[in-house]
Amino acid sequence: MAIMHIRTRFAPSPTGFIHLGNLRSALYPWAFARHNKGDFILRIEDTDLERSSQEAVDVIIEGMAWLGMDIDEGPIYQMQRIDRYRAVIKEMVEAGLAYPCYMSEDELNKLRDQQMANKEKPRYNGLWRPEPGKDLPPIPEGVLPVIRFKNPIGGSVIWNDAVKGQIEISNDELDDLVIARPDGTPTYNFCVVVDDLDMKITHVIRGDDHVNNTPRQINIMKALGGSPPVYAHLPTVLNDLGEKMSKRNGAMSVRDYQKAGYLPDAILNYLARLGWSHGDAEVFTKEQFVDWFELDSLGRSPAQHNPEKLLWLNHQYIQNADAAKLAEACKPFAHQLGIDTENGPNFIQVVGLLKDRANTLIEIAEGAKLFYATAPNLTKDQITENISEAIVPALKDLIEALKNADGTKESYSAAFKQVLAQHQIKMPALAMPVRYALFATTQTPAIDAVLVVLGKEEAINRLSKVVV
């Protein structure tokens, strides 16, 4: 028996805004394709001309590339396939699978109003549906028809959803779907079916807001002689207030997270856990995620966005990152703050010093400003307030001890220990005034590590100014 070659797709509408919930809908089909050594296709559903733009498509592609979600085929644009859709519609009409409907919008609205008044489900009544022995109304002059699909009468549509289990929808609940508008433009549900058939999609992994579209798509697919793919409908992603995540509800875009100093691997790790799990694993690599990913590990309950958890994850990734790679990622943020990373202390060393405390790349850049700023020009009042006369002798001895240091963290630590023992004082009593003398602040990483980055000569020069 031949092994199925897995083909999945992500098919967004290019509206110019892509949030974490959107990206999760891309991540799972991407991971499933990669896990099974299959193909991942990017399809752009851009038939809504008023809302679609190339700039919006670029936002999607950039967001996926930033997270490392590579594509095998695409982007494929639906608007470039219009001729294909029209050809299939023509074939369906000729085969009796679809038909022109001349019911006007006004007539349709009146029908719906009447049905609702009778407490019936609003639906098309099949007026123009051709049946053996049925007389159709006369075709009105000057009216362009829509094309409707002849939905099966009786029976049910049944599919075994990989997330939700077996779902059954009666055909009596479905009316004859419009598959082409009066101007010939094909509609969403029809285009999706033709695309999935042409692209040989084996697994459709998407949000559960598409569940109601699925029976219609299955019926059209079967009418065209195709076999439905495996469907996996993902529960909704809720924002931190329990509402559906959307731009309207204040969701941040992917670009917002980039600008806020989040690492792509942290975002990907976080997205993976929004509806999927592998035991108790919280922090894992992209490679581990792909290796572990299975559809039967997807959750059935809505996932809720937790900004604090995302920030915690970002901290974990920053803390464990290689300092050189992290420095490259930090440079744009440092440059925005006016830091010249090529002049002054070694930027990789600075980042290595700051990364254990930082939650974002912005925090690292903010911390780095200390090391690239000119020496603080402290006033007499500032010195008096922050550096007591009693500690000055210890500071003078520290300057002498530092002159013998060899620039290593260990040698600086030894210099401090020597002075602490000599003056019978505790580390905070000496470290706090040293920090203030060096940077005009008492909040810095470990002082011996700070001295490695700042450099012995610069440290001695700054300390000398406060003990004159």
Curated annotation (Swiss-Prot):
<keyword id="KW-0030">Aminoacyl-tRNA synthetase</keyword>
<dbReference type="InterPro" id="IPR004527">
    <property type="entry name" value="Glu-tRNA-ligase_bac/mito"/>
</dbReference>
<dbReference type="InterPro" id="IPR001412">
    <property type="entry name" value="aa-tRNA-synth_I_CS"/>
</dbReference>
<dbReference type="InterPro" id="IPR000924">
    <property type="entry name" value="Glu/Gln-tRNA-synth"/>
</dbReference>
<dbReference type="InterPro" id="IPR045462">
    <property type="entry name" value="aa-tRNA-synth_I_cd-bd"/>
</dbReference>
<keyword id="KW-0436">Ligase</keyword>
<dbReference type="GO" id="GO:0004818">
    <property type="term" value="F:glutamate-tRNA ligase activity"/>
</dbReference>
<feature type="binding site">
    <location>
        <position position="247"/>
    </location>
    <ligand>
        <name>ATP</name>
    </ligand>
</feature>
<dbReference type="InterPro" id="IPR020752">
    <property type="entry name" value="Glu-tRNA-synth_I_codon-bd_sub1"/>
</dbReference>
<dbReference type="GO" id="GO:0006424">
    <property type="term" value="P:glutamyl-tRNA aminoacylation"/>
</dbReference>
<dbReference type="InterPro" id="IPR008925">
    <property type="entry name" value="aa_tRNA-synth_I_cd-bd_sf"/>
</dbReference>
<comment type="function">
    <text>Catalyzes the attachment of glutamate to tRNA(Glu) in a two-step reaction: glutamate is first activated by ATP to form Glu-AMP and then transferred to the acceptor end of tRNA(Glu).</text>
</comment>
<keyword id="KW-0547">Nucleotide-binding</keyword>
<protein>
    <recommendedName>
        <fullName>Glutamate--tRNA ligase</fullName>
        <ecNumber>6.1.1.17</ecNumber>
    </recommendedName>
</protein>
<dbReference type="InterPro" id="IPR014729">
    <property type="entry name" value="Rossmann-like_a/b/a_fold"/>
</dbReference>
<comment type="subunit">
    <text>Monomer.</text>
</comment>
<comment type="similarity">
    <text>Belongs to the class-I aminoacyl-tRNA synthetase family. Glutamate--tRNA ligase type 1 subfamily.</text>
</comment>
<keyword id="KW-0963">Cytoplasm</keyword>
<dbReference type="InterPro" id="IPR020751">
    <property type="entry name" value="aa-tRNA-synth_I_codon-bd_sub2"/>
</dbReference>
<dbReference type="Pfam" id="PF19269">
    <property type="entry name" value="Anticodon_2"/>
</dbReference>
<dbReference type="GO" id="GO:0005524">
    <property type="term" value="F:ATP binding"/>
</dbReference>
<dbReference type="InterPro" id="IPR049940">
    <property type="entry name" value="GluQ/Sye"/>
</dbReference>
<dbReference type="InterPro" id="IPR020058">
    <property type="entry name" value="Glu/Gln-tRNA-synth_Ib_cat-dom"/>
</dbReference>
<dbReference type="GO" id="GO:0000049">
    <property type="term" value="F:tRNA binding"/>
</dbReference>
<dbReference type="GO" id="GO:0005829">
    <property type="term" value="C:cytosol"/>
</dbReference>
<feature type="short sequence motif" description="'KMSKS' region">
    <location>
        <begin position="244"/>
        <end position="248"/>
    </location>
</feature>
<keyword id="KW-0648">Protein biosynthesis</keyword>
<dbReference type="Pfam" id="PF00749">
    <property type="entry name" value="tRNA-synt_1c"/>
</dbReference>
<dbReference type="InterPro" id="IPR033910">
    <property type="entry name" value="GluRS_core"/>
</dbReference>
<keyword id="KW-0067">ATP-binding</keyword>
<feature type="short sequence motif" description="'HIGH' region">
    <location>
        <begin position="12"/>
        <end position="22"/>
    </location>
</feature>
<dbReference type="GO" id="GO:0008270">
    <property type="term" value="F:zinc ion binding"/>
</dbReference>
